[in-house]
Design a protein with these regions (language model features):
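Carbohydrate-recognition beta-sandwich/jelly-roll modules
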Residues: 1-180
Length: 180
């Protein structure tokens, strides 16, 4: 489904799941939004739940990009660490010394792909970049809170954002991390 309102366009992906022994289907909705005039895609998720059910943890979003030739990853460990994109998994728990800010950047000479969360509360999460010979999958593992459920619907209380700039990692971080 495509939603077009006064300030943004949103793709809504809906899955219907059977979660208990009833014939009732429970929708899970993923929203990918581009605000009018915006540069970053915003990702969010919500799910309707049976009475008394909780979401205890989730991995969201899982954004897969082509692994850039001669690519490197920037994590926010300490004052920032840049590493080659080896075939490995990079993980960093936020907030901690291993992830002092809420983003990862994959870059090479062609530009920078920015992945971050706009979580003003600073909730715990583990940033992950899983590298294969051809792809990089960026995601967050999130321990969920019962407080994120209202009227039987779980909703992640922040958006994750993605964007690309040909101007490099410094442009991505200065332009997109600071404003939120």
């Amino acid at each position: 489904q495509v939603r077009d309102d006064a300030r943004a366009k949103t793709l809504v992906f809906t899955w219907e799941l059977t979660l208990d022994y009833s014939p009732v289907k429970y929708p899970v909705r993923m929203y990918v939004t581009l605000p009018d005039g915006g540069e970053l895609l915003q990702w969010n998720i919500e799910a309707d739940l049976p009475a008394g059910w909780l979401v205890t943890d989730l991995k969201f979003p899982n954004v897969v990009i082509e692994r850039p030739e001669d690519g490197r990853i920037i994590t926010t460990e300490g004052w920032g660490v840049e590493k080659p994109l080896d075939i490995a998994t990079f993980e960093a728990r936020y907030p901690s010394h291993a992830s002092a800010m809420q983003f990862l950047v994959v870059h090479n000479a062609e530009g920078a792909f920015y992945y971050g969360t706009e979580d003003r509360r600073g909730c715990g999460k583990t940033y992950s970049a899983q590298c294969t010979p051809t792809t990089v999958a960026l995601s967050d593992a999130i321990p969920a809170s019962a407080g994120w459920i209202a009227d039987g619907t779980f909703r992640l209380p922040w958006v994750s954002v993605t964007g690309f700039t040909p101007k490099g990692w410094e442009d991505a971080v200065v332009r997109w991390y600071r404003p939120f």
